[in-house]
Amino acid sequence: MPDVRPEVLFVCVHNAGRSQMAAALLSRLGGDAVVVRSAGTAPADTINPAVVAAMAEIGIDLASSGATPKKLTDDAVRASDVVVTMGCGDECPFYPGKRYEDWQLDDPAGRGIDAVRPIRDEIERRIRGLLAELGVSAVTP
């Protein structure tokens, strides 16, 4: 039987902040009901330390989860049902028939944890809305 879980791809420029937080939050809240990926158009070497710290505050351990910035590929876009972009503009590939959303969010690059927390919280709010739109019940962490 084919896998009918929705596949969601989060894309930002460096795949070191917003898209990493979104992927981790969707994985946590969507559980096994969704397939989650993240990527960047120009990936950084490491995830932003303030992002790692902000996620640790809510019990998500990016440091030991194996999460690393990854390069956006055409295959990742083709495999996804929903592509959520976060500040990559025209650098993100477009394929007809895919559902695209562009989330306007502040970039946490170079910012401290106090600036990252509200970005994290806004991403979580949007993730909960996306789950509802996909017909997936959020898992209680």
Features from the language model and the residues they span:
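Short polar/charged helix/loop
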Residues: 1-141
